[in-house]
């Protein structure tokens, strides 16, 4: 039986196929003979309590000039598909949440959603690390300026970041003698109206912020270390960091194995852990990336691991 796979993503016309993990997934699925269907968020809708999609058949090829083609529009229930990859990038806003409810209706009718819609809502990429606090830096989440100031006074060198950012946006390092503590706190909490996260600064960032991929609970044995540019605190590639693929360290393995079973149980089939030194800083569940960079450096088939996991789950359904 041919597997029908849908993908919800940002416009495919604007992606960089050399780096795009979603495109790598589509290539592997197509190689296996899956039928591919393309959707954007605007193509999801509900009617009469059922979730539908205005979708188009999709074919892909690794060609910088002509990497995809779309067939005629098909309007049909999302549950007509066997599996849907939810690969829409953050922001994780109310529109994203509404989309997860629609995907959950399809899940109720037997469609496998990667990642599980309820777990996408439950697992905020920064806050969810609190469930594994023994592996994280010392962390405070609050909107109160006095608590943030006290945290800074106690630990001297801290990182402040919003709970909904991506790509290193709005991440601030506050050293002991920082003259901008007040304005940084005001900015990130929107004058006390929004939560933000404070963590102790990890000097190991100079060796890279490591992206460790976990596929259906199993760690990929290689990671991508994102090394900050000169004078930068952030390793994110989007913030000018340099990527360097490397094998997992013992600490990476320990963290990934500690977190993996819970991720699998929650239906979080494709996840990116962010690890600095031996500390877990984020659990990325919405649209993790770095497949291309790791596969280019090592003999590892991450998209194959993912499709194998999907096929195993479909076989059990």
Where do the language-model regions lie?
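ATP-dependent carboxylate activation and anion-phosphoryl transfer catalytic cores
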Residues: 3, 9, 14-18, 231, ...
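Redox-cofactor binding/interface segments in oxidoreductases and associated redox assembly factors
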Residues: 7, 85-86, 199
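Conserved N-proximal alpha/beta basic substrate-recognition cap immediately N-terminal to
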Residues: 13-141
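Phosphate-binding site of ATP-dependent enzymes
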Residues: 22, 145-146, 153-157, 167-255, ...
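Anion (oxyanion) recognition and catalysis
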Residues: 30, 107, 152-153, 264
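Structural detector of well-ordered beta-strand residues that form the stable sheet scaffold
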Residues: 37, 113-114, 159, 197-199
């Amino acid at each position: 039986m041919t597997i029908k796979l849908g993908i919800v993503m940002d416009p495919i016309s604007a992606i960089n196929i050399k780096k795009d993990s979603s495109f790598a997934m589509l290539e592997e699925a197509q190689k296996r003979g899956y039928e591919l269907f393309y959707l954007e968020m605007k193509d999801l809708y509900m009617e009469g309590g059922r979730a539908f999609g205005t979708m188009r058949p999709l074919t892909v090829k690794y060609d910088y000039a002509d990497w995809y083609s779309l067939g005629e529009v098909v309007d049909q229930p999302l549950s007509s598909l066997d599996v849907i990859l939810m690969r829409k990038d953050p922001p994780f806003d109310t529109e994203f949440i509404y989309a997860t409810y629609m995907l959950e209706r399809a899940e109720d009718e037997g469609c496998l959603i990667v990642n599980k819609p309820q777990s996408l809502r439950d697992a905020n990429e920064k806050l969810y690390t609190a469930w594994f606090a023994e592996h994280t830096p010392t962390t405070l989440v609050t909107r109160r300026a006095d608590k943030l100031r006290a945290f800074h006074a106690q630990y001297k060198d801290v990182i402040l970041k919003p709970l909904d950012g991506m790509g290193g946006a709005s991440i601030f390092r506050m050293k002991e003698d920082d003259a901008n503590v007040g304005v940084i706190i005001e900015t990130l909490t929107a004058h006390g109206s929004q939560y933000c996260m404070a963590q102790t600064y990890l000097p190991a960032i100079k060796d890279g912020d490591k992206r460790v991929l976990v596929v259906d609970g199993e760690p990929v044995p290689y990671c991508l270390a994102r090394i900050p540019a000169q004078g930068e605190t952030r390793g994110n590639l989007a913030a000018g960091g340099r990527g360097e693929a490397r094998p997992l360290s013992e600490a990476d393995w320990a963290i990934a194995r500690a977190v993996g079973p819970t991720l699998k149980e929650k239906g979080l089939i494709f996840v990116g852990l962010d690890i600095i030194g031996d500390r877990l800083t984020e659990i990325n569940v919405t649209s993790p990336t770095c497949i291309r960079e790791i596969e280019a450096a090592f003999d590892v088939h991450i998209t194959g691991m993912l499709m194998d996991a999907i096929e195993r789950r479909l076989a059990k359904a």
